[in-house]
Structures are given as C-alpha cells and as structure tokens.
C-alpha cells in the first residue's frame, strides 16, 4: 500500500512539475512573444527560448504560491497594462510605437494606384464599319487620345502647293495619284486641301477688308462719309465652276 502511494506521489509530482514547467514556459514566452514584442530582433527571441528551455531541462519547479500570481499573457490588470515588469513593458511599448510608425509610413505595391490612359481609336473603328460605332453610340474622348499631327516634308508641301495653284478641289482619282506620288494617304491629302482652302479664303477676306477704307469729313451739321471703291476683287478662276455655255444660232 505504501509502495502504491509512493508511486502515486511520484507520478503526481512529476505530472505537476511538467504542468508547472509548461505553464511557466508559456507564460514566459507569452510575455516576450506578444504581438507587440514580435517587432524586436530574432536574437532576443532565441536567447529567451534557450534560457527557458535550459531551466526546464534542469527540472526547476515553480512555487505554487508564485503560480497563483501568474496571469494570462494577454490578460489586463486594473490599470490597463500587462502583468509584466516595467522594463519589459517599456520595451514592448517602444516596439509597438516603432511598428505603428513603420506600418503607417510603409507603402505596399497594392497601395500605389496606377491609372493607365485610355486610348480610343473611334475614327478608325468608324471607318472600318464597327457595329459599336455604326449604331451612333457616344464615344468618350480623352485629351491624350487625339490624333497625332502629320509633319509634311518640304518636297511634299511644294507638290501640294503646285496642285492647289491649278485647282483648289481635287477629285478622288487625282487624290489617289497624289497620295501614291507623295507617300501619303487619301485622307491626309483631303484634309490638307480643306485647310488650305479655308486659309486662302481667310486671307482673301482680310485683303478685301483692308482695301475698303472710309474717310470721315467732320462738318458742323453732320459728318460726310466718303467711301472708296469697296468692290471685292474677282473670285479666282480656280474657285469658279467653269461651265461651257452652248452657242445659240439665231
């Protein structure tokens, strides 16, 4: 009977020792490996783990009176602080402040928003007969989606000016010939001639306005307005439509 009680006592004591050691290890590790304390260097973690494991291997047993005062690593005391010594609490507080400042200033790749400019080729789609644009749907245009301007060479401009001198309007066949000759597209030549005609009309209108001048002669009763010839210069032949009138034999 005594042997059984002795074995039971040894078993219970060994079991209690393991429980106490494990509990002390958990409490010790919990204090130093809390979420705030994880911000410190790995050498401190290894040192604490080795010290705690060496103490457990030696068979050190905590006093049960001390275990009664041990609190959960994440439990809070009345004043709102963890049940740790002031040095560890100060270190943990500094680590928390450091981690908070680092996380607040750190920018991850997913936080950087990149807006790629959207390019729309609506004109090309309309020319190709795309159903989306042929139905008359509204197209949102961006400032960056404007068509690039074509820089004509001096030889191309010379040929275009010579052709404009003979005729301000070109038929489609002549435009295709010019496009093949100057290595341009039919659309580019068509737009160039449109702009050139508008420029010519604007210059012609300014010249005709400058020719018409008025002279005001001031008198006591009423001013006398004398105007010079305000007749516009005749329209150039290339802007006129020449139609052959049939001769009438009487």
Swiss-Prot record:
Compartments (UniProt record): Nucleus
Residue ranges crossing the lipid bilayer per the database entry: none
Pfam families: Homeodomain
Record-linked SUPFAM superfamilies: Homeodomain-like
CDD domains reported in the protein's UniProt record: homeodomain
Keyword annotations of the record: Developmental protein, DNA-binding, Homeobox, Nucleus
One annotated GO molecular function: DNA-binding transcription factor activity, RNA polymerase II-specific
DNA-binding region: 145-204
Main location: nucleus
Motif (Antp-type hexapeptide): 107-112
InterPro entries cross-referenced by the UniProt entry: HD, HD_metazoa, Homeobox_CS, Homeodomain-like_sf
Disulfide bonds: none
Any one Gene Ontology BP term: anterior/posterior pattern specification
GO CC annotations, alphabetized: nucleus
Family as reported in the entry's similarity comment: Belongs to the Antp homeobox family.
Function: Sequence-specific transcription factor which is part of a developmental regulatory system that provides cells with specific positional identities on the anterior-posterior axis.
Protein name as catalogued: Homeobox protein Hox-C3a
Organism in which the protein naturally occurs: Danio rerio
